[in-house]
Swiss-Prot record:
GO terms for molecular function: 3'-5' exonuclease activity; magnesium ion binding; nucleic acid binding; RNA exonuclease activity, producing 5'-phosphomonoesters. It comes from Mannheimia haemolytica (Pasteurella haemolytica). This is Ribonuclease T. Belongs to the RNase T family. The record marks 80, 150 as: Important for substrate binding and specificity. It holds the Pfam family RNase_T. Homodimer. Its EC number is 3.1.13.-. The lineage of its organism: Bacteria, Pseudomonadati, Pseudomonadota, Gammaproteobacteria, Pasteurellales. The keyword Oxidoreductase does not apply. The keyword Magnesium applies. Mg(2+) 1 binds at residue 26. Its cofactor is Mg(2+).
Length: 216
């Protein structure tokens, strides 16, 4: 028997996004070409529902990543993101350590939330985060990728719709989310702000009565 809207508990995350677990990711790179330029930093944050059915950040992971063999390093990109790839204090690990490490966190959250797959949430998801993540997956021949193969939530698009702003810092300002420009272009910091922004938009829609969907 098919569940009606009234029977579905939308305070459970598995019912909010059709069985998908939103996972916010961001990357820092040594260029703009996902196939040739190094992936240098990866951060991810899972989301959950609180007792009132509001979306909030949950677990996080963060990796500094060593350039893959033969990777291109663009000095201008390093100047932009402030990463010193030769600094031993980075504690950089290989892609084949970082990516599976993120998978472990995502699968654990999927099990806890009763979700079947993860779905990437990222700012400008179709460019840096999506392209570089997918390229790294292929390079290390990763097995059992927990994420949907093509569906993503792009917070730039969503923020343009909700707030009239597509730039992360400007969207956060409109959403009353503190943003420290000095910490921007750190994968972890940008992921934290993107997670807050996505949650704010989802929760705003809930408060405005736009979700759950109206019953017939």
């Amino acid at each position: 028997m098919e569940q009606t809207t009234e029977q579905i508990d939308y305070k459970l995350l598995k019912h909010r996004f059709r069985g998908y677990l939103p996972v916010v990711i961001d990357v820092e790179t040594a260029g703009l070409n996902a196939q040739t330029d190094a992936l240098l930093e990866l951060a991810a944050i899972t989301l959950k529902m609180d007792e009132q059915g509001y979306l909030v950040p949950d677990q996080q992971c963060h990796f500094h990543i060593a350039p893959f063999e033969g990777a291109n390093i663009n000095p201008e990109s390093l100047k932009f993101n402030g990463i010193d790839i030769d600094n031993p204090l980075r504690g950089a690990v290989a892609e084949n350590i970082a990516i599976p490490g993120m998978f472990i966190m995502v699968r654990k959250a999927m099990k806890e939330q009763g979700c079947q797959r993860g779905v990437i949430v990222a700012h400008n998801a179709a460019s840096d985060p999506g392209f570089f993540y997918r390229a790294a997956i292929k390079r290390i021949n990763a097995k059992r990728d927990p994420f949907h193969p093509f569906a993503m939530f792009d917070t730039a698009t969503l923020a343009g719709f909700m707030y009239g702003q597509t730039v992360l810092v400007k969207a956060c300002q409109v959403a009353k989310i503190p943003f420290d420009g000095k910490q921007a272009h750190s994968a972890l910091y940008d992921t934290e702000r993107t997670a807050e922004l996505f949650c704010a938009m989802v929760n705003r829609l809930k408060d405005l009565g736009g979700f759950p969907p109206l019953s017939d």
